C-alpha cells in the first residue's frame, strides 16, 4: 500500500513529530510493510531539499499546493479516494471549513507565509457547495478557519466578504451552528457581527488571536496594533454582540519580553476577562523576522509565564461560567462514556 504523510512545520515540536512519523514509515517500507511513502504539507514545503538528502527512502515530496501533482502520481484507485467526499477526522456532527489558504500578514514570529504563501480566498460558491455536501452527510456545525479570516475576499473580490460568506453559509439547510476561528484584529470586518446578531445559527463566538498586550512587544512582533486599539476593538465587539464569547491566544517569552511586559499582559487579560485564552511559549523559528533577534527568555521563564496567565484565566473562565448554572443550553454531544456526555 501507499502511505501519505501530511506534515506540520509550524513550530519545533510539530516538526519533530512529523520527522519521527516519516522515519517510522520509511523503516516500515524498508521492512516491506508498505510499498511507497509520500510526504506532503508544511514541513515538505519548507524543508524539502534538506529532507530529501536526509531521508532518501521517501518516494516523493509534495508542497502545500501540490495536490494536482500528488493526484497525478497516484494510481486511479487511490485517486478516486482522495477526490471523493471528505472523510471527517472530527466527530460526524461538526467539520472545519477552510475558507482561505496562506497569509499576507508580516508577524515577526510566524513562518506560515513561508510555507503557505500569499493569502488565497476560496470562492464563495465553492464553500457553499462544500457546506451543502457536509450538511447532507450529517454535519450540523461548521467551524470556519483560515490563517486569517479577516482578509477573506480582498484578493478575489477586492473587498472584505466575510459577512456575506457567513450569511450565505447560514442559509444552508441543516447547519445549526457556524463558529468563527482565527480573525486578525487589524481590519476586522465589523459587519460580520451584524450577521452574528441577526442569524440564530451563527454562534456568538469569535476566536481572535491577539498574541500580546505590551505595546513594545506588539511593535516588535509587527502586529500593527496597540493595546489601546485592542481595548477599543474588544469594546466595540462586545457592544455589538453583548452575549459574545471571546477567545484569544497569547505568546509568552518573545525576544525582549521583560517581567514588566509580562505583568502588563497579566493585568490586561485580567481586565479584558476573555471567556477563553490559549497561551503558548515562543518558538524561535528560522527564516522568520524574529529569528534575527536573540531568544533571550529562558524556557523555564517562558513556561512559568504561561502558567501564570493560564492559572489566572482558569479563575476568570470559572467566574464567567457561573451565569450558566441552572440554565438550559443547547449542546452537541461528541461522545458518551460511562454516563458522561
Question: PLM features: what roles do these ranges have?
Answer:
Residues 92-125:
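Canonical Radical SAM [4Fe-4S] cluster-binding loop centered on the CxxxCxxC motif
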Residues 35-41, 46, 51, 136-260:
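Conserved SAM/AdoMet-binding glycine-rich loop
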Residues 292-341:
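Terminal RNA-binding accessory module
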Residues 116-143:
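Conserved alpha-helical substructure of the radical SAM core
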Residues 61, 67-96:
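N-terminal [4Fe-4S]-dependent radical SAM core
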Residues 1-72:
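Cofactor-cradling patches in redox/metallo enzymes
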Residues 240, 260-309:
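C-terminal, non-catalytic macromolecule-binding modules
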Residues 107, 127, 144, 180, ...:
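Conserved, mostly hydrophobic/aromatic
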